[in-house]
Amino acid sequence: MASWRQPFSGRSDAAVATSSNDGEFSDGSLKYVGETGGNSNAVTYQEATGAPVEHDSPLGYDVGPFTIVLINVTMMIGTGIYSTPSAILHGTGSVGLMFIYWTLGYLLCIASGAVYLEFTAYFPSRSGSEVVFLEQAFPRPTWFFPTTFAVQSVLLSFGSSNAVVLATYLFRCSTKDPSNWEIKGVALAGYTVACLCLVFNTKYAYWFQNAIGVVKILTLIFIIITGFVVLGGHTDVQDPKANFRNAFEGTGSASAYGLTNALYRIIFSYGGYNNAFNLANEVKNPVQSLKKYAFAALTTVYVLYMFANVAWLSAVPKKELESSGLTAASLFFGNVLGNSGAVRGLNFLIALSAFGNIMAVIVGLSRRLRECGRLVYSESLLRKNKLTYIHRQGVLPWTPFWVSTKPFGTPLGPYFTTWAITALMILAIPSGDAFNFVSDLGVYPGAAFNLAMAVGLYVVRWRRKRANLPTPEFKAWHILVIFNILVQLFVIVMPWYPPEGGMYAGDVSFWYATYVVTGIGILIACALYYYFWAFLLPKWKGYKLRSEAVILDNGVQSHEIRKVPIDELDEWEATHDVAGRLRQTTVLQSEGPEKVSPRSSDSEAKV
């Protein structure tokens, strides 16, 4: 019988964790446990239904200061700065307001990053960022946010927009005018290669990604220096300072739709400022490390972005830049260097930048999907000390697929998922609309979760104060949290405002708010799915859901959510602590129980 169809008594890769009841306490209806991970001396106090702390990260502790900076920089400096200036300038209407928007994006990232950092101070030994923070901020209804975030993470775990930009700039390296399907084919091939680079070794993948990050920074610095050369009048560009005179001319022509669209492009361009928070359990002393180096990465990118925009505007007339689409950088190189081979080489460097961005996105998504997978629904019945295995389904089905790091020490399941969904998006959406639609679709649900997370920060503060828990190592200023909440509300509400040209005058060839409805539909589908399996099915079939802490291969710790018949709830509660760990070690076999001696909280009982 295949291992995934066997009862747990016949499986060799799962064990039930045991507990000595240390570090447990209650706050009303909520039960909390305190655990320490291998990356920090700070205790992670979390609501007991959350995925357990991994005391020794199976992914290692290879994320140091250099990697923190470069994994964020690599994700931010990808396709945004080369592909969004046209839409941002068009939306804001003027050069001056465009620069204000880039600064607004930087301030928003600081405010949002402060929220991430305070949550990390509360849960320093949990990777996955948003899924952990939402799980702990809103533990009731049980598993609601892990479920909805897990499903939307899977549905939105694609990088097709970056892949399309990669393909576009690769074709710019040649003289060929590609067809729609040629762009799709190269985009899919590029994304596949990026996935393969990450599959075989985590440490070497980080090294390779760091190397690309250095190249990306140097490329942007070269563009900036070239821009200053243009401003100095040392090229054939005529009147390079023309765009900076009357910098706010045209601001009055900006519409509400255009300003909202510009803000979406800004948010997309800074996407990745929080990427290292996904790897918190792989970072030693995560709060101080992320505070220093994530902020350094964000500030570095902000400065580079501002000067890069100066470079674009020094060589490309305003009207020409507004209509350049995704290829502002190619236009810049063409105006400065002509049609020389150097232009093709620089286009390749931008394609390499997009490739590095794809890798960084895959790394962050894989950690979030893995964290979602560590809270998995297992349809199992506990009857008279006999565990009858039926099948597995739920929050994210098939625990080993999501959380296992075999055979290469990398999360193959999440990598495959991101590749499969990206391939579908690349092939399904017209390449001309793919970048705008996908980038907008990713921002809208993200804004909803960021809003919930910022509000949830106040909920966590209130609960911890009431429970008399220690003060966190870092606490965000109120003004930053409030600013973050207001911007997220703006991002959620304003996309409904139509463009001036009518329903089909947006930045895609179809209805302007398609991405809004799609994003809301995804969120509603997640909520309906949760209600079905968490409430309707248990009510119809007469059981309750309870989580059990298990240990999988390589020490990976996860939660199995079991179906326990109502008449056996008392037995379950008597044999498990609030975190789902066995209070005593009882081996469950198909023919009857076998008692073994109790163990400490670090021991395991085979099931």
Regions found by a protein language model. Name each.
Residues L59-V63, L70-V73, I81-P178, A297-T300:
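Extracellular loop-to-transmembrane helix junctions
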Residues A150-V164, Y270, N274-E282, G341-W398, ...:
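Membrane-helix boundary/coupling elements in multi-pass transport proteins
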Residues M1-T92, C109, P538-V607:
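Membrane-interface "cap" regions at the ends of multi-pass membrane proteins
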